[in-house]
Structure formats: C-alpha cells, structure tokens
C-alpha cells in the first residue's frame, strides 16, 4: 500500500497495464460500477462512448450490463482485463475482449474485489512485461526506445 496511490492506477500497473500510453490512450476514467442503490453507474454509458481507458471499481456484479453498453457502441473487440484481489497473494487476472470477458470471468471464477480495465492499453501488457524482463535480466541503464 502506498498512501495516496489509488488501486485504480496501482493494480493495473502491477500487471503491466498502463492506464495511459502515448499513441494509445491519452486519458482514463475511474468509475464506480455499482452505485449505493445497487444500480449501474450512469457514467459507464458515457465512458463507453469515449476512447479513454476505463477503470471500473466495484463492477463485477454489473459486468453483463457493462459489456452490453460497450457492445452497443461497437466496442466488442476492445481489450479488457479483470484483476481480482490485486497486489495480494490471491491475485487472479482474466484477459479478453468486451465480447469475451464474461466467459473468461466465469471460467476463472473472477469475483469481487476486482478492477475492470477496458481499453487498448490492455494489449500492451505483454510488451511491457517483455521490456521489464529485459531490464531485470540485463544491467541496462538509460532510456528504452519502446517505452
């Protein structure tokens, strides 16, 4: 735990998912998926219209509604990551698309507490992991051109 650093940014980062990346996503939104009245936040529909990375907290019970909104906007192929129990020994990660993530969540039995990340930045996870491994295996100092 780092005081002042939100799980909305820290947990994706621990899985090599940046919330912004030059040329991919210029901004991000953090949304509570489920309101106090146990309804889907109306901000999710607004976010589905955007090209920003969308980070949804407390949204697993509304996953079906969330994916339906993104599909209505023609975003069924947009990458999605679900990170359950991020930064703990029980962490689990599911990767898919808007169209496939419900199946992946069921297959891996992903439940709350979880963070849902929707956006093209999810596709950069593997590349960033490779770069990280390169830095860990070599004593490289300086700027990496792929970052």
Where are each of the predicted segments found?
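A contiguous loop/helix-start segment that scaffolds small-molecule binding in enzyme catalytic cores
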Residues: 25-27, 35-147
